[in-house]
């Protein structure tokens, strides 16, 4: 079975990701909320998307913006009530929009009742629901030494000492995010019922599965190899990403999901897998295997980041980006697998600043080119709030303004290990300016109104605004301008539906002139069509050659209104899609 012969709604859908804290504040407290999302569903419908993915709205102490969950079955009061959530789901469904929610079950919050019980005593029945270990020993000052040398993603040790029982618990993310022990079957069943079952019973249409490759840890939790001898804690991902039982767990959870929905209802699951090889990806997303519908790969959004330290930039070429992006979908060729296409999410900066040009001259046209690229690729398209406006990164923020725990945690670790004035710190700030997670988390600009672009009435937002709303980069201005990035995205999504046979399901992807450092070109096929796509990733007029001089080329979409499809010269940041005959 090949991908073209197995159409599904979730393959053809475009999913619009919403970050609740930053979308729309309905009660003027400076935080977005679920009622705010409901109030703007007509805007989402106008764009032409098929589903929304709503980031965590569950009860949480907000150490990591809701990815530290204290109660899977309750809405965080600042976001509203459970009834507000049920109404949001109902109103979305009335508009033909499906609702995907976040499933954050590698870890929970230390405020979750399960962890409180586990923490209370070594004899507690839930003790084994988390990873508790005694100190490896004590240093010369009598301080307990962590059980292994794993480094947390947010800096420092992945272990936190708990005075009450004299043991450490594992947290590969923030200090207050203890990892679940998925080896414990009772724990798994409780997770499924509370996080998956509850929301399926309340009519959600699927899940985005957070860090879905990390549930299975290698037995014994061994020390990681020392790859950076200048720091005490090392990258331990080989011991907890794509672990020995991970596929068993996903099959079990998939079967549980099927048991919770009416016959005939097909839910959507997308896993944040991140890294791995093609064989891993195929097992996760094969229809026959029954684990996930699709997955997110991080390779293309990580280009230019030092693998040993995210907040340290390294040079990359357009070829590097092409190859990395293609990893998102090449593994599904001639399989029953599926995947995703995205450039932005809540953990990424703005794509026009990262991969296009956010200069006033080229921001709009390069945003449109990136939209053309996204809709031309095979896989399910995901758009992040503000991307449809061509939002750029914010400018010139001090560390005191940064809210992201990854950024502040890395800053604290570098300050401790290297010093405030070190070369390492200088590189950190260079990287933070480009790739801070906060770039995607600033409040959505609904208008040019001061002080907060219509996000709140007059309350100070929880995070500072992106100043670009004053430059016409806001929903109100773009909805009045038929040539805006918003309306270009709307048209692009219509074109994707009209040509879904080649744009959504096309296969046999082939790079053309892969080494070219200005042009991204490829062909792909259906059973009876062939497409040629060409994109100019530069601010120069650039000539290109077609792959087959004997064929005729009909341009059917592009990002320049005045483009001549017969010309073999692209304007700056131009993208074109051709059908061949």
Curated annotation (Swiss-Prot):
It comes from the Eukaryota. One of its GO terms (molecular function) is oligo-1,6-glucosidase activity. The keyword Protein biosynthesis does not apply. Keywords: Glycosidase, Hydrolase, Maltose metabolism. Pfam families: Alpha-amylase. Its EC number is 3.2.1.10. GO terms for biological process: disaccharide catabolic process; maltose catabolic process; sucrose catabolic process. It catalyses: Hydrolysis of (1->6)-alpha-D-glucosidic linkages in some oligosaccharides produced from starch and glycogen by alpha-amylase, and in isomaltose. Induction: Transcriptionally regulated by PDR8. Expression is increased in response to the addition of maltose, isomaltose, and alpha-methylglucopyranoside. InterPro entries: Glyco_hydro_13_cat_dom, Glyco_hydro_b, Glycoside_hydrolase_SF, O16G_dom_2. Coiled coil: none annotated. SUPFAM superfamilies: (Trans)glycosidases, Glycosyl hydrolase domain. The record marks 347 as: Transition state stabilizer. CDD domains: AmyAc_SI_OligoGlu_DGase (cd11333). The active site is at 210 (nucleophile), 272 (proton donor). Alpha-glucosidase with specificity for isomaltose, maltose, and palatinose. Belongs to the glycosyl hydrolase 13 family. This is Oligo-1,6-glucosidase IMA5. The gene is IMA5.
């Amino acid at each position: 079975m090949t991908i073209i012969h197995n159409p599904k709604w979730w393959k053809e859908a475009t999913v619009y990701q919403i970050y609740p804290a930053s979308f729309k504040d309905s009660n003027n407290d400076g935080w977005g909320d679920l009622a705010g999302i409901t109030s703007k569903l007509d805007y989402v419908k106008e764009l032409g998307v098929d589903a929304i993915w709503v980031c965590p709205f569950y009860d949480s102490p907000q150490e990591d913006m809701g990815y530290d969950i204290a109660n899977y079955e309750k809405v965080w009061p600042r976001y509203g009530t459970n009834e507000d959530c049920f109404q949001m789901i109902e109103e979305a469904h009335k508009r033909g929009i499906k609702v995907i929610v976040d499933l954050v079950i590698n870890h929970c919050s230390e405020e979750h009742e399960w962890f409180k019980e586990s923490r209370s005593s070594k004899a507690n029945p839930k003790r084994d629901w988390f990873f508790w270990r005694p100190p490896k020993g004590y240093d010369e000052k009598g301080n307990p030494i962590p059980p292994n040398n794993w480094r947390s993603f947010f800096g420092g040790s992945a272990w936190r000492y708990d005075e009450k029982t004299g043991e450490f618990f594992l947290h590969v993310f923030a200090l207050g995010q203890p990892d679940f022990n998925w080896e414990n079957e009772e724990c798994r069943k409780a997770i499924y019922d509370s996080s998956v079952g509850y929301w399926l019973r309340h009519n959600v249409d699927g899940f985005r599965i957070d860090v879905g490759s990390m549930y299975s840890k290698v037995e014994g939790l061994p020390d990681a190899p020392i790859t950076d001898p200048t720091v005490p804690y090392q990258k331990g991902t080989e011991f907890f990403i794509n672990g020995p039982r991970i596929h068993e767990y996903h099959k079990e959870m998939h079967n549980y999901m099927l048991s919770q929905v009416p016959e005939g209802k097909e839910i959507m699951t997308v896993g944040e897998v991140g890294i791995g090889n093609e064989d891993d990806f195929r097992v996760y997303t094969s229809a026959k295997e029954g684990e996930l519908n699709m997955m997110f790969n991080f390779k293309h959004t990580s280009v230019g980041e030092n693998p040993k330290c995210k907040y340290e930039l390294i040079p990359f070429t357009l070829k590097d980006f092409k190859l990395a992006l293609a990893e998102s979908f090449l593994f599904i060729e001639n399989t029953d697998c599926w995947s995703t296409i995205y450039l932005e999410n809540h953990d990424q900066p703005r794509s026009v600043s990262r991969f296009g040009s956010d200069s006033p001259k080229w921001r709009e046209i390069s945003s449109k080119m990136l939209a053309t690229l996204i809709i031309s690729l095979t896989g399910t398209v995901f758009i992040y709030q503000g991307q449809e406006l061509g939002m750029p990164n914010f400018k010139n923020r001090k560390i005191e303004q940064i809210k992201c725990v990854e950024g502040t945690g890395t800053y604290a670790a570098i300050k401790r290990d290297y010093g405030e004035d070190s070369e390492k710190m200088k590189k950190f700030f260079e990287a933070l300016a480009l790739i801070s997670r906060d770039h995607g988390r600033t409040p959505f600009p609904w208008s040019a109104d001061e002080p907060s672009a219509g996000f709140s009435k007059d309350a100070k937002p929880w995070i500072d605004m992106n100043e670009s709303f004053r430059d016409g980069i806001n929903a109100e201005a773009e909805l009045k301008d038929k040539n805006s990035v918003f309306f270009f995205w709307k048209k692009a999504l219509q074109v994707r539906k009209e040509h879904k046979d080649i744009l959504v399901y096309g296969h046999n992807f082939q790079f053309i002139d892969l080494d070219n450092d200005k042009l991204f070109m490829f062909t792909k096929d259906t059973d009876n069509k062939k497409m040629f796509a060409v994109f100019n990733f530069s601010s120069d007029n650039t000539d290109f050659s077609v792959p087959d001089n004997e064929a005729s080329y009909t341009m059917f979409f592009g990002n320049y209104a005045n483009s001549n499809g017969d010309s073999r010269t692209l304007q700056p940041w131009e993208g074109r899609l051709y059908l061949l005959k």
